[in-house]
Amino acid sequence: MKQIEWKSYFNHTLGFLKYFGQRFNSDNTNITAGHLTYVSMLSLVPLLVVMFTVFSAFPMFDELKENLEQALFANLLPTSGEQLEEYLNEFVTNASKMTAIGVGFLFIVAIMLMSAIDKALNSIWRDSSSRHWLVSFAVYWMLLTLGPVLIGSGLAATSYLMSLSQFADEYVSGIQSFVLWFVPIVTSFVFFVLMYQLVPNRQVKFRYAAFGAVIAALLFELSKQLFSLYITFFPTYQAIYGALATIPILIVWIYLSWLIVLIGAVLTVSLEEYQLQQPEPKSD
């Protein structure tokens, strides 16, 4: 009996993976990731300017601004973060000297990135309906203004947890290391769940969004470690590109990040569709 159950479970899993592969290819996920990478490269500096501008409006987060910068640059690029931070800080400083019209233009460019993300995810859900442009603009504006506040609150909570873990590590060895490993995964999981549930124009059940978010969060953390190892032990890119080596590395990392985001989205919608296609169990 158990052998039959395991065989059924194996066939069910194999069928789902096959369906996921077909969905991944039919949605041209790798091409979509490339498009989002291109838009992200254009929108990166405007988005950072908008975020830091909003942060400066809340003095309570002044102490956390440096932590936010470190977290952003660590996730933007697992290695070469210091060099990237130097470049982007220079860009942000130059952009902050712009007039009100220039800052407004930066907001528009940042909103273009969010619009591209919206369209990409809804294309995966194959939802042709669209929000009114005023509603979309209001949502994007709210995310741009409230997003930094939520990030600041999350960093404050993370800093508090880290201080507690450092204290507890004196009594139980390994707690701080566990928190350092666990908190980024939980943060990524929450981010992906919110994205997969709120961005699509149709209702997505939490269990499906959570499934895709777990896989995406684990892949994201694993890719950071593997990418760091590759950059550290196989630095051939530096010999080829020299001082410009950070640029292609950043492009590749942003592409991998978007690919993971889209993989999680395809997993979420594939699981939902595959479950609906399965015949209902016969009642005795």
Swiss-Prot record:
Keywords associated with the record: Cell inner membrane, Cell membrane, Membrane, Transmembrane, Transmembrane helix
Entry annotated with the keyword Chloroplast: no
InterPro entries listed in its UniProt record: UPF0761_bac (IPR023679), Virul_fac_BrkB (IPR017039)
CC terms in the record's Gene Ontology section: plasma membrane
Membrane topology: Multi-pass membrane protein
Highest taxon in the source lineage: Bacteria
Pfam families according to UniProt: Virul_fac_BrkB (PF03631)
Transmembrane regions listed in the UniProt entry: 41-61, 98-118, 137-157, 178-198, 214-234, 247-267
Compartment list: Cell inner membrane
HAMAP family: UPF0761
Family: Belongs to the UPF0761 family.
Protein name from the UniProt record: UPF0761 membrane protein IL2447
Originating species: Idiomarina loihiensis (strain ATCC BAA-735 / DSM 15497 / L2-TR)
